[in-house]
Amino acid sequence: MSGHGPAQPMTARRSGPLKGRAEIPGDKSISHRALILGAMAVGETRITGLLEGQDVLDTAKAMRAFGAEVIQHGPGAWSVHGVGVGGFTEPAEVIDCGNSGTGVRLVMGAMATSPLTATFTGDASLRKRPMGRVTDPLALFGTRAYGRKGGRLPMTLVGAADPVPVRYTVPVPSAQVKSAVLLAGLNAPGQTVVIEREATRDHSERMLRGFGAELSVETGPEGQVITLTGQPELRPQTVAVPRDPSSAAFPVCAALIVEGSEILVPGVSRNPTRDGLYVTLLEMGADIAFENEREEGGEPVADLRVRASALKGVEVPPERAPSMIDEYPILSVVAAFAEGLTIMRGVKELRVKESDRIDAMARGLEACGVRIEEDEDTLIVHGMGRVPGGATCATHLDHRIAMSFLVLGMAAEAPVTVDDGSPIATSFPAFIDLMAGLGADLAAG
């Protein structure tokens, strides 16, 4: 079983101006998908810039367990010798996906239409997260799932021996659910159709096309209609993974709120389905310039030049939530340093992430002297242009909560401690060194 070592408290103190280049790790969403699609292609896929956080390493291990040869050649440089669509072999061991909701749900989708059985588990946080939202649509293909009460891990999936194509409307915007259904559809005959009422991040669609799948996206009265033709032969690719906009959010937001800062963040994905935070920050008055805009691996990228800014509160519309679902914790920190109310609506999905992120941010911000209002679906931050700080904040084993409160401490009047900084390694292992290199005052304990 996945475990968790001793807690590693960390403290951030008010920092001088942040200066320099922030080299962000590769995008987590694209890294997971590159490994999985590489394993389902016939031949060798080469990947550069792969994120080597624990979540992605767990997906690499899972692909090995299903029979693909996954080799690391150097930092970020990997190759995957795929076994083809329908070529997975039954794993001999339990598949441990650690902390990764994305990893477990995508891998479940990838194996769901093969005639084999696999058992999945994860760490204490992942074992609390509901899997029914993925196993319900997979059941339509003929997959059977046996999990703990409430559809939780550990869970055994019995893949469909004779899968049927599926037409599925995603009930709650979720790129993970959409992607799991599309990956399952690869080994089903005929056409699998996924309907989204609200668009979510589209890395799976872009990458499936890149690997040679026949996939179309049309807008109809029901929403976005994605049609995938099953049982293609996927062709191996060379994948250059752009830098992760969700990880870039932390140094970007730190530079906005730490007085006198100016940083450059090169090569960040500007995928429009992931751009909600940057749209919101610009509305708040952030000084962010997008330089050297270009395309890499089918994804738009740019270098971000960020300067400290006087910010004002804004209302974030609910329809923006899918394009920034992982960024609300750090946005709520920025909102605390803005002048006026920031109202974030349509955020109930945050309650079933690695932690209940609305509750975790609300309690931590209140402890730091910020006035908060919340209900099931809304978070309101009363920005005062300054934050007293001086608190210890609970991270609930959630990497984004940990990084958000450390950024808060860099600009607060008194130091801010997080009870455990170790989960940061799941998505951004170099976060502490990177921020310290820019001038942040961070220390263990």
From Swiss-Prot:
Location of the active site: 326 (proton acceptor)
Catalytic activity: 3-phosphoshikimate + phosphoenolpyruvate = 5-O-(1-carboxyvinyl)-3-phosphoshikimate + phosphate
Alphabetical UniProt keywords: Amino-acid biosynthesis, Aromatic amino acid biosynthesis, Cytoplasm, Transferase
Disulfide cysteine pairs (residue numbers): none
InterPro entries registered for this protein in UniProt: Enolpyruvate_Tfrase_dom (IPR001986), Enolpyruvate_Tfrase_sf (IPR036968), EPSP_synthase (IPR006264), EPSP_synthase_CS (IPR023193), RNA3'P_cycl/enolpyr_Trfase_a/b (IPR013792)
Gene Ontology molecular function, alphabetical: 3-phosphoshikimate 1-carboxyvinyltransferase activity
Assembly notes: Monomer.
Name the record gives this protein: 3-phosphoshikimate 1-carboxyvinyltransferase
Organism: Cereibacter sphaeroides (strain ATCC 17023 / DSM 158 / JCM 6121 / CCUG 31486 / LMG 2827 / NBRC 12203 / NCIMB 8253 / ATH 2.4.1.)
Name of the gene: aroA
